[in-house]
Amino acid sequence: MNKVKKVPMRKCVVTGEQFPKKELIRVVRTPEGNVIIDQVGKANGHGAYLSRNLKTIDMAQKKKTLDKALEVEVPNEIYDELRKIIGENIG
């Protein structure tokens, strides 16, 4: 009998939609209070997930959704880096 592997699902903090964990980008507030983009998904700290969509990133920055989810001010450089990552995956 074959076992069906469970796919871990996570919710985008901006849209509220659920996606498989590997399809989302994780942004982490480290224990030191820094904000980093966790490409591997193993970084230590409080994480929030975003869908890989430029509109989602723009909305997160405009509404400060990541700031609220991570309980810290997210620098503009993080949003720029997120856009760059998404742009590389598209093109």
Named regions from a protein language model:
Residues C12, S51:
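Short cysteine-rich clusters marking metal-coordination/redox-active sites
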Residues Q18-K21, L54:
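Cys/His-rich metal-chelating microdomains
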Residues D58, K63-G91:
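C-terminal structural segments of small proteins and small subunits
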Residues M1-K5, E88-G91:
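Short, Lys/Arg-enriched, disordered terminal segments
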